Amino acid sequence: MSLLIDIVDETGSVSEEMLKEVENLLQFAAEREGVQDQAEVSVTIVSNDDIHQINKEYRGKDAPTDVISFALEEEGEGEIEIVGAEMPPVLGDIIISADRTREQAEEYNHSFKRELGFLAVHGFLHLLGYDHMTKEEEEEMFTKQKELLDAYGLKRS
């Protein structure tokens, strides 16, 4: 099973080693979640200013955030499934603020690597349809996040 991952660090502040770690973690999560082989996802690391603009434009929230996901393979109400479209899905985009990652790592007293991994998995689970709008959804999603991160070896310190 292999996920096709395109990772871009627009800030130039995240090491190649750390970007590779994100790729490995997402491959691990995709395998554990049974994601279709050759499914595609993009990860973009941006500044607080950039994610602030994205958050304002697409979510109507005038503040920076840590991670935003844009799922591309959601069937909307009234849409029909395309017969014969067996192409691997394009799951969507995960956008992570490098600045917020650093701030939150410090705030929660754990490593940048752990926080970046947490945010990548959080965004990835959103692409797979998980959410945290209700207490039940939040419990399911956050339990899944913790299980994946712990199994991968990125436990909270």
Curated annotation (Swiss-Prot):
Pfam families: YbeY (PF02130). It is found in: Cytoplasm. The lineage of its organism: Bacteria, Bacillati, Bacillota, Bacilli, Bacillales. GO terms for molecular function: metalloendopeptidase activity; RNA endonuclease activity; zinc ion binding. It comes from Bacillus subtilis (strain 168). This is Endoribonuclease YbeY. Belongs to the endoribonuclease YbeY family. Its cofactor is Zn(2+). It is an enzyme of class 3 (hydrolase). GO terms for cellular component: cytoplasm. Its main location: cytoplasm. Zn(2+) binds at residues 122, 126, 132. Its EC number is 3.1.-.-. Single strand-specific metallo-endoribonuclease involved in late-stage 70S ribosome quality control and in maturation of the 3' terminus of the 16S rRNA. Binds 1 zinc ion. Coiled coil: none annotated. GO terms for biological process: rRNA processing.
